[in-house]
């Protein structure tokens, strides 16, 4: 054999079988950075149609987690696939840099501002801390193979961005959407600040649930309203609440105008009580109160009780019964304790009736000094004292510990309160902002489509947006308000423009350093500077204006796509929509795509306490970023994304299949020069033409899946192509021709041309997902080419040629089915020790007329398709008794061991081996391939 070994075209490539990604990827990243790859991509797309994916900024605090990785990888896949489709798709990563979490970290290090350190120094420390966090996260994101302008990202703390945030607010003000008001807002007593909706989490909490009687000022008159005259007992209206601490701020009792309310007399412990309850809740209440007996004296509609007055249970004033649409009968009594300073519904109904917005609670959650009974007590600790006082006053009908869902601070994980404070708001209704936003939502493509109804409900129900915070590290609300009237300065918009110019030069500290007289002159004494800062959701929500509209690489194009986790419907998607609609009347995006959260193999959230956290850094260090990227792409992101070591190992197995396919392609393109050796598709061997045609059809499907952001379909189709059409069929069949045909002959060059086309297409298909591997393949592909696959477009060399004489896809699919049946019978023969390998087999195919015509069409080349040394086709009716039935009714098979000698070079068993004097160990075909013009192949 040694004489003939060197006549074979054995595969050869520098592309290793093992990816060794964890070690090789960092080397590739160094080259990408050194070569300025991102800029090369930008230069390759000058003048093309822009596609703008705007990066929602992660918070500059802590290490990235698996959810961050999912988000960045999905974005990168889209940007790379859009670039491959010819778009100019810049990617500018960003970071959210202001706000409370950074303040808390800096406080731990240097103390609170104004104590050991000035506010200005504190801000500088916050800026430094945020910059350090950005650097750490940036390295981790780059390691994932995400291409972008990493050296010039946007930071919400950049002076220019801070200035643009102020300019955006001035436009909101100019359009009439800002107002100041005393309103109940989510308030964290630990933060000492208002919280945005997105900063509130709901957790279970145990609270005292109490039923409290408010006695009527004139019980007889109330009884008369029910049609009961000369009634001698006191009549009370009963509320049920889980926040006893809010009772000092009670200013009304809300009832539903449409509900029936009953006057109920009941006896407990020998004492008669008369109470007003929603009729449908009477039985439940009587059971709860432990009534020994009860009777309903009369019923009336709630509307008849409007403005009836009742005594506060422990304060020296009375309160009205008022009508509210927020009253339900899900629980309680059908009467709602109403404290306008401590609840949004209470506030709204209170405004209608002109109620006082009482707020006896300070920033720290402690009752103010003038609060009767409870001064100096923390509200949650005061609950028990309120209950005790109610009991003492005879107003407590029932008390029980009650477990329920309650709002908590996202940062401190502690219960929060609703508290009325003077704040700045973007009004949802003053200038039809809500209506405009709802109209805009309909113009946007939401992916998945349930995102639309989700954000619609949120916009329909959301209160005015409280955009002010009482913090140190944030973009200032750069307003001057009159010291007496609290009115905004009439020139606020132009003043803000001047302040923004200063901030652009000096950063936000410029506002606190500013002497009002510099801008206001003599008016300065009449006005004071606002000291509040902006909600950080305003910072990030305005980046469509402060970043995208401001940076030249976006060409003033506007944003095509926002892509974030599904929690951002109430976060970044919402804040961006509100600000953009308030500024321009239009939404800031055309498409919004959301992905699910990552959970472990059992569907649980990632948690350090459970020990199920999978850190992206560990995955890249062990398996490589391409394995993580393949998992992200292969997972349907519309739901929860399940990840575990086992799942990642499965991704690694799938990756190996793709890598092995790429290696086969490269190894068999050894010595192929497309400039000189490429065979035109119409001149190819029929099977090669089929392979190119399949690749062309697949490319269309893959491009379509990329365009629809269905990356799991891309990976499914790719895996099927590598495993079935290539691995189990085409590549298996062509090995013989590739290795044994004449090196320069048509049979081999046809095959190599098909492999070249497939490799050129496939390297582009995988580039958005398996970026490192695609680069590795690209560097080893034959022919002259640009430095990087990432500057390319989808491969144009695939032609879906259909010649009149061509064998159809259906023909080859039938042949694949026949081949599978033959393989089964040969495998059984091997198990029975009748044959060794398939080349030791002679197969006889007994086929019906239709199948016979197909099988004989390719003549002697059928044996190459079946990988046997001999293949005979005979009529089905002539099937011998030993013929094996197959799953095809049209086919029976007989497999026998060949008696012919084995060719030393190609290993086929042929009758002529031993008859050729010059080459006694070779078959005719091999002699022709060594000494002659090479064998002729037409079909396979």
UniProtKB/Swiss-Prot annotation:
Zn(2+) binds at residues 903, 906, 923, 926. The keyword S-adenosyl-L-methionine does not apply. A motif ('KMSKS' region) lies at residues 605-609. Keywords: Aminoacyl-tRNA synthetase, ATP-binding, Cytoplasm, Ligase, Metal-binding, Nucleotide-binding, Protein biosynthesis, Zinc. CDD domains: Anticodon_Ia_Ile_BEm, IleRS_core. L-isoleucyl-5'-AMP binds at residue 564. ATP binds at residue 608. PROSITE patterns: AA_TRNA_LIGASE_I. Its cofactor is Zn(2+). One of its GO terms (biological process) is isoleucyl-tRNA aminoacylation. Pfam families: Anticodon_1, tRNA-synt_1, zf-FPG_IleRS. InterPro entries: aa-tRNA-synth_I_CS, aa-tRNA-synth_Ia, Anticodon_Ile_BEm, Ile-tRNA-ligase, Ile-tRNA-ligase_type1, Ile-tRNA_ligase, M/V/L/I-tRNA-synth_anticd-bd, Rossmann-like_a/b/a_fold. Its EC number is 6.1.1.5. A motif ('HIGH' region) lies at residues 58-68. Belongs to the class-I aminoacyl-tRNA synthetase family. IleS type 1 subfamily. IleRS has two distinct active sites: one for aminoacylation and one for editing. The misactivated valine is translocated from the active site to the editing site, which sterically excludes the correctly activated isoleucine. The single editing site contains two valyl binding pockets, one specific for each substrate (Val-AMP or Val-tRNA(Ile)). This is Isoleucine--tRNA ligase. It comes from Shewanella oneidensis (strain ATCC 700550 / JCM 31522 / CIP 106686 / LMG 19005 / NCIMB 14063 / MR-1).
């Amino acid at each position: 054999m040694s004489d003939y070994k060197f006549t074979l075209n054995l595969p050869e490539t520098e592309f290793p079988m093992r990816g060794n990604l964890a070690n090789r990827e960092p080397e590739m990243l160094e080259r990408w950075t050194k070569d300025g790859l991102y800029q090369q991509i930008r230069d390759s797309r000058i003048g093309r149609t822009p596609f703008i994916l705007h990066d929602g900024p992660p918070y500059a605090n802590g290490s990235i987690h698996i959810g961050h990785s999912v988000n960045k990888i999905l974005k990168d896949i889209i940007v790379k696939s859009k670039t491959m489709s010819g778009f100019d798709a810049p990617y500018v990563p960003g970071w959210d840099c202001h706000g409370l979490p950074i303040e808390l970290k800096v406080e731990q290090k240097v103390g609170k501002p104004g104590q050991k350190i000035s506010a200005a120094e504190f801000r500088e420390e916050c800026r430094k801390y945020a910059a350090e966090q950005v650097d750490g996260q940036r390295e981790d994101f780059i390691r994932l193979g995400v291409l972008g302008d990493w050296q010039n990202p946007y930071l919400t703390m950049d002076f220019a961005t801070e200035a643009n945030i102020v300019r955006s607010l001035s436009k909101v003000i100019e359009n009439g959407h800002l107002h100041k008001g005393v309103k109940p807002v989510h308030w964290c007593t630990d933060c000492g600040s208002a919280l945005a909706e997105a900063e509130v989490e709901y957790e279970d909490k145990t609270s005292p649930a109490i039923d409290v009687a408010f006695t009527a000022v004139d019980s007889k008159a109330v009884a008369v309203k029910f049609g009961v005259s000369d009634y001698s007992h006191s009549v009370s209206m009963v509320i049920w609440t889980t926040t006893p601490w809010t009772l000092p701020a009670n200013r009304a009792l809300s009832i539903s105008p449409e509900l029936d309310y009953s006057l109920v007399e009941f006896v407990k412990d020998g004492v008669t009580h008369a109470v007003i309850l929603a009729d449908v809740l009477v039985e439940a209440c009587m059971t709860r109160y432990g009534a020994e007996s009860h009777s309903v004296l009369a019923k009336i509609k709630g509307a008849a009780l409007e403005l009836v007055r009742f005594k506060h249970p422990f304060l020296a004033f009375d309160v009205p019964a008022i009508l509210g649409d927020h009253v339900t009968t899900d629980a309680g009594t059908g009467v709602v304790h109403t404290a306008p300073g401590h609840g949004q519904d209470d506030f709204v109904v209170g405004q209608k009736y002109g109620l006082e917005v009482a707020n006896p609670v300070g920033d720290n959650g402690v009752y103010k000094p003038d609060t009767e009974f409870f001064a100096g007590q923390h509200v949650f600790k005061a609950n028990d004292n309120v209950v005790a006082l109610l009991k003492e006053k005879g107003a407590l009908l029932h008390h029980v510990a009650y477990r329920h869902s309650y709002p908590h601070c996202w940062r401190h994980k502690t219960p929060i309160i609703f508290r009325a404070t003077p704040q700045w708001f973007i009004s949802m209704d003053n200038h039809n902002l809500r209506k405009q936003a709802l109209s805009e939502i309909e113009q946007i493509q939401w992916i998945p489509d349930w995102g639309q109804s989700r954000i619609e409900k949120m916009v329909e129900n959301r209160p005015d947006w409280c955009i002010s915070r009482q913090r140190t590290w944030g973009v200032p609300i750069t307003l001057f308000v009159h010291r007496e009237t609290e009115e905004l300065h009439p020139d606020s918009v132009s003043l803000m423009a001047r302040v923004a110019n200063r901030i652009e030069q000096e950063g936000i500290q410029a506002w606190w350093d500013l002497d009002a007289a510099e801008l206001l002159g003599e008016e300065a004494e009449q006005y004071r500077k606002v000291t509040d800062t902006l909600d950080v959701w305003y910072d990030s929500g305005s980046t469509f204006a402060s970043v995208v509209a401001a940076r030249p690489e976006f060409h003033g194009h506007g944003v095509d796509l926002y892509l974030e986790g599904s929690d951002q419907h109430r976060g970044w998607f919402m804040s961006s929509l509100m600000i953009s609609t308030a500024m321009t009347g239009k939404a800031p995006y055309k498409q919004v795509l959301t992905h699910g959260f990552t959970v472990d193999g059992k569907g649980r959230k990632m948690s350090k306490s459970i020990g199920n956290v999978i850190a992206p850094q560990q995955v890249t260090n062990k398996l490589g970023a391409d394995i993580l990227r393949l998992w992200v792409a292969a997972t349907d992101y519309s739901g929860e994304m399940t990840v575990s070591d086992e799942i990642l190992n499965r991704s690694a197995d799938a990756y190996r299949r793709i890598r092995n396919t790429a290696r086969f392609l490269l190894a068999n393109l050894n010595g192929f020069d497309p400039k000189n050796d490429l065979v035109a598709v119409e001149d190819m061997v029929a099977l090669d033409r089929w392979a190119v045609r399949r690749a062309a059809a697949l490319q269309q499907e893959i491009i379509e899946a990329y365009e629809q952001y269905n990356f799991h379909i891309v990976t499914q189709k790719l895996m099927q192509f590598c495993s079935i059409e290539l691995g189990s069929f085409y590549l298996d069949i062509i090995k013989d021709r590739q290795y044994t045909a004449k090196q320069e002959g048509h049979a081999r060059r046809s095959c190599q041309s098909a492999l070249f086309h497939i490799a050129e297409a496939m390297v582009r298909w995988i580039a958005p997902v398996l970026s490192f591997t695609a680069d590795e393949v690209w560097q080893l592909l034959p022919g002259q080419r640009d430095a990087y696959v990432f500057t390319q477009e989808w491969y144009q060399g695939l032609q879906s040629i259909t010649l009149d004489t061509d064998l159809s896809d259906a023909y080859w699919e039938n042949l694949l089915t026949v081949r599978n049946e033959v393989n089964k019978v040969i495998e059984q023969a091997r198990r029975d020790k009748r044959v060794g390998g398939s080349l030791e087999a002679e197969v006889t195919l007994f086929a019906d007329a239709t199948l016979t015509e197909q099988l004989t069409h390719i003549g002697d080349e059928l044996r190459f398709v079946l990988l046997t040394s001999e293949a005979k086709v005979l009529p089905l009716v002539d099937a011998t008794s030993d013929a094996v039935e197959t799953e095809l009714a049209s086919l029976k098979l007989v497999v026998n061991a060949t008696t012919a000698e084995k060719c030393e070079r190609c290993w086929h068993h042929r009758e002529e081996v031993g008859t050729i004097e010059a080459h006694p160990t070779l078959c005719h075909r091999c002699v022709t391939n060594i000494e002659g013009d090479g064998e002729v192949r037409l079909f396979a």
